[in-house]
């Protein structure tokens, strides 16, 4: 490699680092960046899935400032829950977006640049999977690989982090949300129906990987995809759950827009990121998951909203 080529690579890496930092400012910018990347590279299905899941994360964040959760969570609990959502999604983006951009530039120059992924601390697992995709063009395998990677990326620094365990994942509110299936990812459609899947045992990486694969099957289900995409393409993401609730006739906003209630946070890796991959993963991780029988959740959603309101009302009464 000559001096000119070395300079070009350094310039490219610096550009990717700047773009990643800029797009990783908050939930809104991350969500929009994932969607924009998919629109340019529709073969990278994970990017659209990530945008939809990121919308859900934004809704969960602003729920904490909404009228329901203001009743049920103390201010300190709200801050810890928000920090867990924000930190996990920031960490996933900081790992995934450089991968997406290196793929973009690989296409531009006509040769794979995935040997540079290590510069951004990306797992050896993904370096191998991107190289495989470059040659085989198996879009579903790459989508699954990115799901596997993202959930393993957050397992140690977020899910198993002692502070987050104490203040979020081992708390009664979190156990209740797990038990009552409040940990549900919702995909609104443009024709006024909600679809989604719940996850239990959220702290288990295997369960979150399973959920991610099921969500990918749901999102790209031929008879539903165009309606999902129309929602994503026509409804701007504000972070408020009202973005989707107005699709089913709800007229009262119960959670604020994200940028009206949360400032941008300054994150750093703090030496917590290590390669989770140790040479082997379970073969079942690449196996397609069947969808649950019940995926249309419009009535279920309305019932759960009432149930959550009742739960917090009882908690408030007990505090008196």
UniProtKB/Swiss-Prot annotation:
InterPro entries assigned: DUF2515
Domain of life: Bacteria
Protein name, UniProt field: Uncharacterized protein YppC
Provenance organism: Bacillus subtilis (strain 168)
């Amino acid at each position: 490699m000559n001096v000119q080529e070395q300079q070009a690579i350094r310039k490219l890496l610096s550009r990717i680092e700047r773009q990643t930092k800029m797009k990783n400012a908050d939930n809104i910018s991350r969500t929009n960046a994932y969607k924009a990347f998919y629109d340019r590279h529709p073969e990278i299905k994970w990017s659209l899935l990530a945008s939809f899941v990121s919308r859900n994360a934004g809704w969960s964040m602003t729920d904490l400032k909404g009228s329901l959760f203001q009743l049920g969570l103390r201010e300190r609990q709200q801050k810890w829950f928000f920090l867990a959502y924000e930190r996990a999604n920031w960490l996933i983006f900081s790992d995934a977006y450089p991968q997406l951009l290196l793929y973009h530039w690989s296409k531009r120059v006509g040769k794979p640049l995935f040997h540079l992924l290590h510069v951004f601390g990306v797992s050896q697992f993904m370096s191998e999977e991107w190289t495989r995709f470059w040659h085989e063009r198996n879009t579903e395998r790459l989508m699954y690989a990115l799901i596997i990677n993202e959930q393993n990326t957050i397992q140690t620094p977020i899910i198993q982090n002692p502070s987050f365990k104490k203040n979020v994942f081992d708390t009664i509110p979190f156990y209740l949300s797990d038990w009552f299936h409040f940990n549900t990812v919702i995909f609104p459609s443009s024709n006024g129906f909600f679809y989604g899947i719940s996850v239990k045992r959220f702290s288990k990486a295997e369960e979150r990987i399973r959920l991610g694969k099921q969500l990918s099957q749901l999102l790209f289900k031929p008879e539903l995809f165009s309606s999902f995409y129309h929602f994503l393409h026509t409804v701007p993401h504000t972070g408020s759950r009202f973005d989707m609730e107005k699709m089913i006739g709800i007229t009262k906003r119960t959670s604020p827009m994200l940028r009206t209630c949360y400032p941008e946070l300054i994150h750093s890796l703090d030496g917590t990121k290590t390669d989770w991959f140790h040479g082997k993963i379970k073969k079942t991780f690449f196996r397609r998951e069947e969808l649950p029988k019940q995926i249309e959740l419009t009535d279920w959603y309305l019932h759960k909203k009432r149930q959550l309101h009742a739960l917090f009302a009882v908690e408030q009464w007990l505090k008196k």
